[in-house]
Swiss-Prot record:
The gene is RPS13. CDD domains: Ribosomal_S15p_S13e. This is Small ribosomal subunit protein uS15. Keywords: Ribonucleoprotein, Ribosomal protein. The lineage of its organism: Eukaryota, Metazoa, Ecdysozoa, Nematoda, Chromadorea. GO terms for biological process: translation. SMART domains: Ribosomal_S13_N (SM01386), Ribosomal_S15 (SM01387). It comes from the Eukaryota.
Length: 151
């Protein structure tokens, strides 16, 4: 898929392993991996950070192959899922940082333009998550309350 506000074609992608079974050298069971996921979530880590730690420290390449569920679904079952999806959270965080920058540097026209692009991505992603019912239908992005969402 191509990039949204960029001329790049977006061709490169990570290579997924062909075999969909659990590696024979992995010693962790499904219950142990789920326990690790909940333990890391209690520390305040986001799902992508949990996946990186499991990959680097414990050798779990893909949690879904071991447990049968994705990290977010495991967290949802335990009632620990983030209220805002992670990609939307990071876009809101970026918009808040750009706004903070613009308060100090009012003449920075390029940052003002980039803020418009980031906020259009936020609105598009929010519309997608509303149709998928991962966000309530009444949820709305407002720049005045955005800093409270990411703090």
């Amino acid at each position: 898929m191509g990039r949204m506000h960029n001329p790049g074609k977006g061709i490169s992608q990570s290579a997924l392993p062909y075999r969909r079974s659990v590696p024979t050298w992995l010693k962790l069971t499904s219950e142990e991996v789920q326990e690790q996921v909940t333990r890391l979530a209690k520390k305040g880590l986001r799902p992508s950070q949990i996946g990186v730690i499991l990959r680097d420290s414990h050798g779990v390449a893909q949690v879904r192959r071991v447990t049968g569920n994705k990290i977010v679904r495991i967290l949802k079952a335990k009632g620990m899922a983030p209220e805002i999806p992670e990609d939307l959270y990071h876009l809101i965080k970026k918009a808040v940082n750009i706004r903070k920058h613009l308060e100090r540097n009012r003449k920075d026209k390029d940052s003002k333009y980039r803020l418009i692009l980031v906020e259009s991505r936020i609105h598009r992603l929010a519309r997608y998550y509303k149709t998928k019912r991962q966000l309530p239908a009444t949820w709305k992005y407002e720049s005045s309350t955005a800093s409270a969402l990411v703090s």
